[in-house]
């Protein structure tokens, strides 16, 4: 059975990941929030930077946009039925996320669970660094673990069929980009 979870390695190049990581390391981070816009560390414990891809003055947005558009088109070629549900367009708001050792998104969730995200068809996430001790994403319904590898992009359906959670690393920092 197909799981519709696609992996695109090297969707961001090493230099692009390093540029974005440097941006994260010099930015002001805020505690991560969950779908009710509240900090609930027992569900999601992270440091975030919310950004808007429409701000073309930010080079991080330009890097992300160029790669995301390319791979959304790849995904649509592999799964043309996705546009028959609802023409798929990206939401320009996304998060740069930093999970320090011991932090993570602990609770199983899907990506169209709130009123704000109820029309979401697909979900995406880039890994900015390789994490060898945890840091993975676990899709429960498929018993599938996706490794956090620098430059890797995941695209998957946003629905209840794709409940997932982070696997916490207790020794390494995980850096990622994900829609919100």
Predicted regions: what they are:
Residues 1-155, 159-178:
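Fe(II)/2-oxoglutarate oxygenase catalytic core
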């Amino acid at each position: 059975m197909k799981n519709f979870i696609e992996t695109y390695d090297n969707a961001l190049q090493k230099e692009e990941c390093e540029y974005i990581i440097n941006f994260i390391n010099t930015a002001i981070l805020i505690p991560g929030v969950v779908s009710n816009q509240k900090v609930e560390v027992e569900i999601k414990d992270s440091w975030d930077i919310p950004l808007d891809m429409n701000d073309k003055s930010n080079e991080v947005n330009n890097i992300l946009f160029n790669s995301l558009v390319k791979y959304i088109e790849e995904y649509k070629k592999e799964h043309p039925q996705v546009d028959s549900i609802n023409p798929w367009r990206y939401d320009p708001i996304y998060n740069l996320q930093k999970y320090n050792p011991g932090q993570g998104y602990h609770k199983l969730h899907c990506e169209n669970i709130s009123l704000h995200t109820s029309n979401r068809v697909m979900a995406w996430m880039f890994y900015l660094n390789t994490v060898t001790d945890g840091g993975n994403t676990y899709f429960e319904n498929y018993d599938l673990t996706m490794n956090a590898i620098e430059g890797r992009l995941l695209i998957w359906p946003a629905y209840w069929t794709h409940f997932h959670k982070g696997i916490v690393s207790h020794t390494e920092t995980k850096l990622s980009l994900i829609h919100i």
